[in-house]
């Protein structure tokens, strides 16, 4: 119940496998990569995962209710403006979006339609439960669906992002 104090929360939100850890964000910052979150979860749930489980301090976040649901790009564009200012266009840095659903990939495709001069890159990754060795076949199938939906890149691990040159896309 998102209306309860999160110290009383239990279940999946408290023990779901996460794709990242706090060190990942420190590494992004060290490499000059600006980051934020667009979440389909309610604000309280998203903040619980980001702040309590990952230990991030007031991370940039657009959550359910802050913008229309994905694949509408409004939340993604709103967060990008918040992080970069209103500097969209071919002279701006590429903006990457990592997601684990087809709606995430379609959000990027729709952002390109809204601001065609800006380079938006869709990066797909399978959700945490498919990263188990026993689910490799399902994961491969899921990643193919992300690619077929239009993902520019599929990551096997979120940590691979550090080695990706987004200017190549």
Question: What annotation goes with each model-predicted range?
Answer:
Residues 1, 124-128, 159:
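Short loop/turn segments at strand-loop or loop-helix junctions that form parts
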Residues 1-37, 44-47:
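Short, acidic loop-to-helix structural element flanking the phosphoryl-transfer center
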Residues 9, 14, 36-96, 102-116, ...:
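Substrate-recognition "cap/lid" segment bordering the active-site pocket of phosphatases
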Residues 62-63, 124, 156:
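Structural signal for conserved beta-strand scaffold positions within catalytic alpha/beta enzyme cores
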Residues 84, 161-169:
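Short amphipathic alpha-helix with an adjacent loop that forms part of the alpha/beta core around
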Residues 97-153:
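Acidic, Mg2+-coordinating phosphoryl-transfer loop and its flanking beta/alpha structural elements
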Residues 152-161:
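Short acidic-hydrophobic, aromatic-tinged amphipathic segments that line or gate anion-handling sites
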């Amino acid at each position: 119940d998102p209306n309860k104090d999160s110290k009383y929360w239990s279940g999946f939100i408290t023990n779901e496998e996460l794709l990242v850890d706090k060190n990942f964000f420190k590494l992004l910052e060290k490499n000059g990569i600006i980051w934020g979150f667009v979440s389909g979860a309610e604000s309280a749930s998203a903040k619980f995962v980001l702040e309590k489980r990952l230990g991030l301090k007031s991370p940039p976040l657009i959550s359910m209710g802050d913008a229309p649901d994905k694949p509408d790009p409004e939340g993604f564009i709103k967060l990008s403006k918040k992080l970069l200012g209103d500097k969209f266009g071919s002279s701006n840095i590429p903006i990457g979006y990592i997601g684990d659903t087809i709606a995430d990939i379609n959000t990027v495709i729709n952002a390109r339609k809204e601001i065609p001069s800006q380079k938006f890159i869709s990066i797909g990754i399978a959700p945490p439960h498919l990263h188990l060795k026993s689910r490799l076949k399902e994961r491969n199938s899921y990643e193919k669906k992300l690619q077929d939906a239009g993902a520019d890149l599929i990551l096997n691990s979120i940590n691979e992002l550090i080695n990706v040159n987004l200017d190549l896309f």
